[in-house]
Amino acid sequence: MARYLGPKLKLSRREGTDLFLKSGVRAIDTKCKIDNAPGVHGARRGRLSEYGVQLREKQKVRRMYGVLEKQFRNYYKEAARLKGNTGENLLQLLEGRLDNVVYRMGFGATRAEARQLVSHKAILVNGKVVNVPSFKVAANDVVSIREKAKQQARIKAALEVAEQREKPTWIEVDGGKMEGTFKRMPERSDLSADINEQLIVELYSK
């Protein structure tokens, strides 16, 4: 499946929630009727079946983290093999992706921008260039901006935006040095309450 390259707000309207695909503290302004489905007049949302609700939740989380369908299913399979709660394991695997960590640290204004930074070899992990967005970041790994990329205006702008966001407790960032430490995997209570991971587990368990 190809990566979606269309309007980002259209995806958020489809899911009925802010997927944080646009830069800024509040990604969607009041002019975007997020509660309306895509379309000129915003089609009415019909009552979804149980399967439909589960599918929408999966699509919402998949799009939020910018992961393709096959990748997402593989993350679920890995989460199911791990000890503990499968849904929480899934969210931790997604949070541990390098592109997501770069976003959480504020080096990219969006996950898509963070993914570009990784792909363009602007990111170091423990002093070594890593250009794989899905790279698994481990506890105490140090993620930083490569020296020759530190003057990029978009990185500086992203750090300014990040100053206005709530700072993740599982990450420590030095904006001046443009580096951060992934202290630990986030607990479920650290993450968005707007995600119902149990619906995804139920979907894939069928």
UniProtKB/Swiss-Prot annotation:
A cellular component term, taken from the record's GO annotations: small ribosomal subunit
One Pfam family, short name: Ribosomal_S4
Assigned keywords, A-Z: Ribonucleoprotein, Ribosomal protein, RNA-binding, rRNA-binding
GO MF annotations, alphabetized: rRNA binding; structural constituent of ribosome
Any one biological process term the GO annotation gives: ribosomal small subunit biogenesis
InterPro entries: Ribosomal_uS4, Ribosomal_uS4_bac-type, Ribosomal_uS4_CS, Ribosomal_uS4_N, S4_RNA-bd, S4_RNA-bd_sf
Disulphide bridges, residue numbers: none
Family: Belongs to the universal ribosomal protein uS4 family.
The protein's role, per its UniProt record: One of the primary rRNA binding proteins, it binds directly to 16S rRNA where it nucleates assembly of the body of the 30S subunit. With S5 and S12 plays an important role in translational accuracy.
Subunit structure: Part of the 30S ribosomal subunit. Contacts protein S5. The interaction surface between S4 and S5 is involved in control of translational fidelity.
Protein name, entry field: Small ribosomal subunit protein uS4
Organism encoding this protein: Vibrio campbellii (strain ATCC BAA-1116)
Lineage: Bacteria, Pseudomonadati, Pseudomonadota, Gammaproteobacteria, Vibrionales
